């Protein structure tokens, strides 16, 4: 008789894990749809590239480790890693970037530690940060939302730009990034940070086309609301708990409000922080990763609050416009310490 030796954790429930990952993938549909609507078909192409890359990379490592490829890939975690990375990068980023980031996330940030359940850092955010540090220009080249864009690439144009850098008519990223004011557009957070450093007043900045939205940046507010809708559905399905999203958003809103009240000429208003960038994606889909987040209820509140504080600090005073990825990874580092001091007292034992 042959016995198969499996690595810990031995209580791992494959069916339950697969179901939760599938629920998260389904909950991402509103956010993906919003990004497709406002930023074009490039998002879908990036998702397909990332998904295939994640599956192939994990299959290769599992084969080398002589583990069951089919059984492991059925947990859907590889697909989720690819999806989270794909929706975090600009929709028309070169194809090799999403492949590189996804392969790094799947192999180095996940399988190198032993696979799902043993990685200390969120794999998708590791891949994102590697790309952001290595290729900052490409990683910050977001298209303007279609409502303020001059050139809206179709499906074929998106594929051509991703794989060749040019559309069929010879257009490139510089022409595609032009807004209705004839100026290359950036995200609301990037525009605010750059303009403040250039000495522009907040009143002037709020007149830019990118801030033509009702609540925050054009397009971005609806993208964030779509991710919020998906996150609320996850809460309703009990696929995630409320502690991390709530503490993250409350802390971010509180810090942003206090900062804005004390320095309204240099710091962004709270609605811009809450409805721009990757705020809602981070709150409900990234920080709630059960493997890399805190495991106690008090710990989850602390973990979410820490991430919210870090996001505000990085956005307001750091060198990057959106600090969600860095905040997630920095918060991941503190998880063992948080869990140690927030673990429930064993019955019959004194505190201390």
UniProtKB/Swiss-Prot annotation:
Location of the protein in the cell: Cell inner membrane
Membrane topology qualifier: Multi-pass membrane protein
Record-linked InterPro entries: NqrB/RnfD, RnfD_bac
Record's keyword annotation contains Translocase: yes
Pfam families assigned to the protein according to its UniProt record, in alphabetical order: NQR2_RnfD_RnfE
GO cellular component terms given for this protein: plasma membrane
GO biological process: electron transport chain; transmembrane transport
FMN phosphoryl threonine modifications at: 187
Cofactor: FMN
Oligomeric form and interacting partners: The complex is composed of six subunits: RsxA, RsxB, RsxC, RsxD, RsxE and RsxG.
Membership in a protein family: Belongs to the NqrB/RnfD family.
Protein name from the UniProt record: Ion-translocating oxidoreductase complex subunit D
Natural source organism: Escherichia coli (strain ATCC 8739 / DSM 1576 / NBRC 3972 / NCIMB 8545 / WDCM 00012 / Crooks)
């Amino acid at each position: 008789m042959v016995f198969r030796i499996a690595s810990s954790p031995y209580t791992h429930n494959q069916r339950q894990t697969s179901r939760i990952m599938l629920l998260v993938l389904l909950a991402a549909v509103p956010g993906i749809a919003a990004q497709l609507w406002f930023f074009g078909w490039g998002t879908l192409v990036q998702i397909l590239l990332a998904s295939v890359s994640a599956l192939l990379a994990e299959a290769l490592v599992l084969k080398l480790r002589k583990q069951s490829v089919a059984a492991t890939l059925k947990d859907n975690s590889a697909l989720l890693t690819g999806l989270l990375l794909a929706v975090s990068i600009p929709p028309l980023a070169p194809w090799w970037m999403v492949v590189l980031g996804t392969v790094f996330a799947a192999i180095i940030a996940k399988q190198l530690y032993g696979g799902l359940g043993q990685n200390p850092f969120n794999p998708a955010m590791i891949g994102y940060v590697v790309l952001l540090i290595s290729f900052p220009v490409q990683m910050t080249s977001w298209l303007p939302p279609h409502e303020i864009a001059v050139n809206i690439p179709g499906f074929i144009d998106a594929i051509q730009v991703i794989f060749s850098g040019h559309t069929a008519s010879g257009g490139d990223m510089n022409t595609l990034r032009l807004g209705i004011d004839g100026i290359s557009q950036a995200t609301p957070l990037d525009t605010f940070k750059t303009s403040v450093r250039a000495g522009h007043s907040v009143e002037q900045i709020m007149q830019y086309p990118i801030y033509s939205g009702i609540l925050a940046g054009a397009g971005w507010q609806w993208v964030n609301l779509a991710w919020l809708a998906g996150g609320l559905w996850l809460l309703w399905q009990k696929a995630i708990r409320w502690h991390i999203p709530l503490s993250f958003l409350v802390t971010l809103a509180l810090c942003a409000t206090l900062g804005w009240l004390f320095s309204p000429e240099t710091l962004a208003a709270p609605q811009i922080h809450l409805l721009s960038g990757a705020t809602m994606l981070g709150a409900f889909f990234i920080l709630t990763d059960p493997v890399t987040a805190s495991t106690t209820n008090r710990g989850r509140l602390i973990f979410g609050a820490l991430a919210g504080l870090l996001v505000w600090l990085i956005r307001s005073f750091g060198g990057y416009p959106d600090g969600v990825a860095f905040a997630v990874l920095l918060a991941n580092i503190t998880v063992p310490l948080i869990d140690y001091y927030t673990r429930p007292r064993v019955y019959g034992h004194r505190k201390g």
